[in-house]
Each structure stands twice: as structure tokens, then as C-alpha cells.
């Protein structure tokens, strides 16, 4: 029975960045700190998509694979889809495994545009592309950062099962009200 199950507590930081995007220290240092200094159980790197080059995406996937140890320290490969609010706003995208396609909101700060055909310029395009490629194991949540997510404009409950209500950016009760007004089921 679920009621008889012991409640387990896990500590994690799912949204951090490194010097390759807008943070400090390398991505390697970020995961090393999360595991060996902060003693987290789970961690994810959410670099802004328009700053993640093909080279860094490959490197980031290699780092998450290296640090992921089942039942010890879980890493979640992913990125921050960083569309402007009028296009759906920030979404954190997490994959259950490495080497997935990064679908950027733009290549604004990336010179190499050889994979620009994978860009999704709106949150709805992101959800449609995940559906088209049968990536229903992808987890997306609406993020209230610099370009706050507009879940009234774009939402797909098959991927976006949660919204960010509180972070170091502040508390965002309005996003819960938006979800209820739209009849969304969120956790």
C-alpha cells in the first residue's frame, strides 16, 4: 500500500548554470560541487539554449553521463528553453538519458547554425516537436525566470506536469492561478 510506504527525502538542485552559459565555474565543477560539496542526491544543468553550442551540448551530456550513479547521485541532462514570454517563456527541459536533440528557442549567441532546423521558436513548437519525435519521456516545467513562462499561451500536460512556484527569483503564485483558470492539472 502507498500509505504504508516509508517517505524518503531527496535533496536536489535542478536548475543551475556554469560559465559556458551565465554561471560561474565549469560544468564539470558544477556537478562535482553538487555531488561532493553540497551532497545533493540529484542535479541538472539548465543552461540557456541560445548559448549552448553543439560542442558544449556534447560535453554536457558526457559530464552528466559520467556523474550519474544510480541510487547514489542522479544527473538529469537538459537545458533551459529560453523563449521570450510572448512566445511561451522559459521552460526547463529534462531528458531521462543523454544524447537527445536540443531544440533551441534561437541561435542568438551561437555562430554555428548548422543545426538551426531543430530550433523551436515557440513553446507550442517545442511541444509539437517532442510529440512528433515520440519523446513522451521528456519532462518540461514552466520556469519563472527572466522570461517568465506563459502557460496560458502554451502548455502540453503530456510533457509539462509541473510549474515553478518558488525559486531564488521569487514566489510566483500567479502561475498556479493561471493553471487553475485554464483547467490544467499540475503538480
Report the location of each language-model feature.
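Extended, charged catalytic domains and RNA/DNA-binding interfaces, predominantly
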Residues: 1-187
Amino acid at each position: 500500500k502507498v500509505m504504508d510506504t516509508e517517505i524518503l527525502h531527496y535533496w536536489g538542485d535542478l536548475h543551475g548554470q556554469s560559465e559556458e552559459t551565465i554561471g560561474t565555474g565549469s560544468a564539470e565543477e558544477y556537478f562535482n560541487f553538487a555531488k561532493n560539496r553540497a551532497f545533493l542526491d540529484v542535479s541538472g544543468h539548465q543552461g540557456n539554449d541560445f548559448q549552448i553550442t553543439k560542442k558544449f551540448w556534447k560535453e554536457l551530456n558526457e559530464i552528466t553521463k559520467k556523474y550519474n550513479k544510480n541510487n547514489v547521485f542522479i544527473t538529469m541532462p537538459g537545458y533551459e528553453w529560453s523563449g521570450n514570454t510572448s512566445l511561451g517563456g522559459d521552460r526547463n527541459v529534462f531528458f531521462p538519458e543523454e544524447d537527445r536533440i536540443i531544440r533551441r528557442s534561437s541561435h542568438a549567441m551561437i555562430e554555428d547554425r548548422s543545426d538551426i532546423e531543430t530550433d523551436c521558436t515557440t513553446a507550442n513548437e517545442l511541444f509539437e516537436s517532442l510529440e512528433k519525435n515520440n519523446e513522451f519521456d521528456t519532462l518540461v516545467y514552466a520556469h519563472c525566470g527572466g522570461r517568465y513562462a506563459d502557460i496560458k499561451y502554451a502548455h502540453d500536460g503530456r510533457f509539462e506536469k509541473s510549474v515553478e512556484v518558488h525559486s531564488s527569483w521569487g514566489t510566483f503564485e500567479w502561475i498556479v492561478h493561471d493553471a487553475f483558470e485554464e483547467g490544467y492539472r499540475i503538480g
